[in-house]
Amino acid sequence: MSREIKDGFVSVPKGCYIQLEKKAAKYILDNIRASYGNTAGLVTRVASFTEDSGLELTLKNFLDYYHLDPRAIYKFSSFSRICAMADAIEDFSEPLEETLTKAFARLAVVDSRRWISFLLNVLPRLDNIDFSALPDAEKRMMQMFYVTVWGKAAEDWDDEEVLGNLYALSDSTVLLNELLALLRYRFEQIDFIDEPVELGFDCPLDLHCTYTRDQLLVALDFMKPSTVREGVKWLPEKNIDVFFVTLNKADKDYSPTTMYNDYSINESLFHWQSQSTTAESSPTGQRYIHHKECGSMVLLFVREFKADRMTGGVEAYTYLGAANYVKHTGSRLMNITWRLDRPIPAKFLKKTNKLVVG
């Protein structure tokens, strides 16, 4: 219905015509959106889904039929719990329901083919895997998953708590099946080419994919991601500077000294402002300027807003890859122009350069 209203009822029979006043159309669309805007509305939709659509009730069918982003569900509950509330499936009780329900919203934006393929392979057989024997890249992908669900890195894959958490996931069959369905859905939705970025070690982060701060840091072997509060992180063991860029900064979230003006100049150049305490003559400033000679790399992760406007949680970052110093002006703070190794795709460019100020 929403699509018909927006498109002008193009599907009505030949010779028929429907026109809504702008105010009436807005009123109807607002009411349709409101029906998905709470748990009760979703329960009602689920209860009548098969009758309304003629389709089997599955997560994919529900999302496709109503043109929903998975986060529209996961901001409230799991799809399985909503189905149980609608008496569409039997009620269930599983050990990880609360933990997984919170994690679903973060997993609903995963868009790396490599990571999703790994998870689809490993999650159905968690109780038959020697995690400590996995190849390095797969260990890192497992860490990314673990920190997403449990909020901290797994320091030791043989640790009793870590194994207990993973085995509890294996025992949560209803929600594990939902997780696998979500991952398959996300894989089908990927509409860009992702590829590895050469960092000198087997890193599972892929170009132009979406990652939370915690996911990307554990993928870079930094196991205390929650300690990172600033927009930069130097990883000396890897010789990597990680930049976390938020393009649209709200006054309530940032102080006057952290309202940095960051944006893409074009598909290859990115304007970035250092921290206000960074002088060009400082070790950090010199490392930025001479990173090639120093043998270090700069990685750029960009998001549009701090908060995910759909869930209210923290928005994830798009990985723009490695960047190289071009020039700078100023000191305390430094205005640096970086050249990206790979150009920004058009769909991301609309977001990264729309905030340029004159």
Residue ranges and their predicted role:
Residues 2-17, 280-283, 334-342, 356-358:
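Low-complexity, flexible helical/coil segments
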Residues 24, 36, 262-263, 353-355:
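Short, charged/polar low-complexity linear motifs in solvent-exposed/disordered segments
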Residues 133-242, 246-250:
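Charge-dense, extended regions
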